[in-house]
C-alpha cells in the first residue's frame, strides 16, 4: 500500500453474515466446566448435574439472551430451563421464572460465569464429582463456576 492511499473494506453481505456463519450465536452449546471436566447436563425429570461424555444428548443447551448480559439456559432434549432456587439448589424448570435468568460474563481467562440474577451473589457451579454446587457455596475465583461454551452441533 502506498503512503497516503486510502483503503476501503468490503461491504458486509446482505444477509448480515460476516466472520461467523449465519445462526452462529443461536446454535446449541455445551457448557464445559473447568472443575473436573464436566459438561452441564439438564435431565427431563428436572435434575441438573455434570457428565464427561459430550455425546450425552442432555448436555445440548440453548442459551437465549433475555436482555443485555442476561441469559436463560434451556436443555434442548429435556425442554426445561436451568433455575436456581432460594436455597441455592440447581434444578430444571418446565417454564421460565425469575430464577431462570443468569448474568453471563466473559472472564479474563476466557471462561464464562453464570451468576443468578435473582440471588445475585450465587453462581452456577459444578463440583469435581459432577454434582452441582449449592449457590451459597460459590464465589468469584472458584474453578467450579468457570464454563467454556462449546458448539453442540452434530
Swiss-Prot record:
Proregion residues excised on maturation: 1-9
Cross-link entry Glycyl lysine isopeptide (Lys-Gly) (interchain with G-Cter in SUMO1), positions: 94
One GO term describing the cellular component: nucleus
One BP annotation, GO: negative regulation of wound healing
Entry keywords, A to Z: Angiogenesis, Developmental protein, Differentiation, Growth factor, Heparin-binding, Isopeptide bond, Mitogen, Nucleus, Phosphoprotein, Secreted, Ubl conjugation
Site (Important for interaction with integrin): 127-128, 133
Disordered, as annotated region: 1-20
Positions of the UniProt region annotated as Heparin-binding: 127-143
Binding, heparin: 35
Keyword Nucleus (UniProt): yes
Source organism, top-level taxon: Eukaryota
Residues annotated with Phosphotyrosine modification: 81
Database matches in InterPro entries: Fibroblast_GF_fam (IPR002209), IL1/FGF (IPR008996)
Tissues where this protein is expressed: Found in all tissues examined.
Subunit structure: Monomer. Homodimer. Interacts with FGFR1, FGFR2, FGFR3 and FGFR4. Affinity between fibroblast growth factors (FGFs) and their receptors is increased by heparan sulfate glycosaminoglycans that function as coreceptors. Interacts with CSPG4, FGFBP1 and TEC. Found in a complex with FGFBP1, FGF1 and FGF2. Interacts with FGFBP3. Interacts with integrin ITGAV:ITGB3; the interaction is required for FGF2 signaling. Interacts with SNORC (via the extracellular domain). Interacts with GPC3.
Similarity comment text for this entry: Belongs to the heparin-binding growth factors family.
Protein name listed in UniProt: Fibroblast growth factor 2
Amino acid at each position: 500500500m502506498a503512503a497516503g492511499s486510502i483503503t476501503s473494506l468490503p461491504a458486509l453481505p446482505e444477509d448480515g453474515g460476516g466472520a461467523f456463519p449465519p445462526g452462529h450465536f443461536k446454535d446449541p452449546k455445551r457448557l464445559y466446566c473447568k472443575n473436573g471436566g464436566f459438561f452441564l447436563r439438564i435431565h427431563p425429570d428436572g435434575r441438573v448435574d455434570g457428565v464427561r461424555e459430550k455425546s450425552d444428548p442432555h448436555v445440548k443447551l440453548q442459551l437465549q439472551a433475555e436482555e443485555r448480559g442476561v441469559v436463560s439456559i434451556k436443555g434442548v432434549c429435556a425442554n426445561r430451563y436451568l433455575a436456581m432456587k432460594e436455597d441455592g439448589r440447581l434444578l430444571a424448570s418446565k417454564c421460565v421464572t425469575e430464577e431462570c435468568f443468569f448474568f453471563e460474563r466473559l472472564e479474563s481467562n476466557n471462561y464464562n460465569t453464570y451468576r443468578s440474577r435473582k440471588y445475585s451473589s450465587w453462581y452456577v457451579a459444578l463440583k469435581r464429582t459432577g454434582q452441582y454446587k449449592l449457590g451459597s457455596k460459590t464465589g468469584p475465583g472458584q474453578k467450579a463456576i468457570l464454563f467454556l461454551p462449546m458448539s453442540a452441533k452434530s
